[in-house]
Amino acid sequence: MPWQAFRRFGQKLVRRRTLESGMAETRLARCLSTLDLVALGVGSTLGAGVYVLAGEVAKDKAGPSIVICFLVAALSSVLAGLCYAEFGARVPRSGSAYLYSYVTVGELWAFTTGWNLILSYVIGTASVARAWSSAFDNLIGNHISKTLQGSIALHVPHVLAEYPDFFALGLVLLLTGLLALGASESALVTKVFTGVNLLVLGFVMISGFVKGDVHNWKLTEEDYELAMAELNDTYSLGPLGSGGFVPFGFEGILRGAATCFYAFVGFDCIATTGEEAQNPQRSIPMGIVISLSVCFLAYFAVSSALTLMMPYYQLQPESPLPEAFLYIGWAPARYVVAVGSLCALSTSLLGSMFPMPRVIYAMAEDGLLFRVLARIHTGTRTPIIATVVSGIIAAFMAFLFKLTDLVDLMSIGTLLAYSLVSICVLILRYQPDQETKTGEEVELQEEAITTESEKLTLWGLFFPLNSIPTPLSGQIVYVCSSLLAVLLTALCLVLAQWSVPLLSGDLLWTAVVVLLLLLIIGIIVVIWRQPQSSTPLHFKVPALPLLPLMSIFVNIYLMMQMTAGTWARFGVWMLIGFAIYFGYGIQHSLEEIKSNQPSRKSRAKTVDLDPGTLYVHSV
């Protein structure tokens, strides 16, 4: 029957990952300590942002109030980081948001998440490699770019770069080889570079507070006119705004915070190390929280020092810190800062490249991507094929493409992953424990099963009979979370696209927003009234269900700020991914194979959310 075939097809799209009871066993080498994960998170997050982004945001968007921008951005990133930390404690396996989605919301969403994570890491790797090449070229007087532009220029504007970047190509291939040697070797390099980076940033902070002038946070129009009279190249001056500490108003802080949010992207690479961390359930949450805290303190202190050292409208976006030291008369210090920037970009590059092959490996091992990509090198115990293939693709993009137009595309993939992880945490916290004692396979969220004593009623939505999660209460939360995702998307769309009528008091749009808010609040109350799982974890997100929902709202709102061209490129990337999934992955998925082999199915077990049985390795 056509209906039955359609139903079976739909079940394939939402089937959830089932794992063997010994899921702590891994073919990868468990060699990463908590310090390694903190170094990886700080290195990948505290990269180009602190040396480039701070100058751009302070000059054009926020002025000295950039310190508030970083605070707002850090708070929004912490929301996502807390959700990642809880999932890292629940499911200590490679794959990051991909696996988290697979065990919770189903195969199609998991593939979508993993496919976009691959896009984010590839673009991030290529763009940082280009930035490293440019920073090194600037340090030696731009000889590389001048030579290549004069001899091998590319004449395809808005598509390709001005010239092929052989330096970036070689850099990515070199680091690909380093990652292929093993995680512990690359972790050592990351720790060294991150240490140098933090020392340089410490020097910048101390210098800024010693040589800084509080008057630069109180600039007036007279100061601006004086600067124009003193400078010959007044075209390099940024806008004054209204002067003072918040020269561009509250709107400038929000615009700056939206940009600064991307300076914290990168901590999620810690969540991909579940099969290589020595104690993943403890070290992954600690690594995420500590790395985000360190990065916020560094961003806050450096941006404060930078805006105290020189007027915000005179900052150079491309190289704000070296120019600031020139401004205060410490010219030799710019070389110290240059070394720090190269170390920061190096760790950021490793941070982008490290999770890329591991997400590919996790998807290939599950059969959603080509199985050859899951091959493990017997000597180094690293995903050698996935590492080499992803490195070559990233090197090719760094070699030919100018990636400034693709940054927003990278952000969509990252924000989508953050949102799905938050939804997964919300759903899992309200599910009953699913340890399978009879050997029968049980999905993480099963269909609503009611008994004579448990029926779905309006009273039961707000006053459930049980104090522990049941299949019915778990299904209620699953459905309510799906409805909330739709309603929050609609609310963010209205706020982003029709903000002017709302601010002007348009009754229609005001009524729409009020209605959406009432529905959202009502569903949140229903979720809040359901019993939560009491499974002990090393880390749990506080204030459920509010914190995950706040994270989802912020992420979706930022996605709504993307341009139509960015969404069009996103659509092309997703078409390629769906062609692979429906042409190969849906038929070769491990879950598909299990469903066709009853003998194996009888022995399969789902994810055991009890850490005592889930993870047996001890340090």
Swiss-Prot record:
GO terms for molecular function: amino acid transmembrane transporter activity; L-arginine transmembrane transporter activity; L-lysine transmembrane transporter activity; L-ornithine transmembrane transporter activity. One of its GO terms (biological process) is L-ornithine import across plasma membrane. The modification Phosphoserine is found at residue 618. InterPro entries: AA/rel_permease1, Cat_AA_permease, CAT_C. Glycans are attached at residue 232. N-glycosylated. The modification Phosphothreonine is found at residue 606. Keywords: Amino-acid transport, Cell membrane, Glycoprotein, Membrane, Phosphoprotein, Transmembrane, Transmembrane helix, Transport. The keyword Zinc does not apply. It catalyses: L-arginine(in) = L-arginine(out); L-lysine(in) = L-lysine(out); L-ornithine(in) = L-ornithine(out). It comes from the Eukaryota. Belongs to the amino acid-polyamine-organocation (APC) superfamily. Cationic amino acid transporter (CAT) (TC 2.A.3.3) family. Uniporter that mediates the uptake of cationic L-amino acids such as L-arginine, L-lysine and L-ornithine. The transport is sodium ions- and pH-independent, moderately trans-stimulated and is mediated by passive diffusion. This is Cationic amino acid transporter 3. It comes from Homo sapiens (Human).
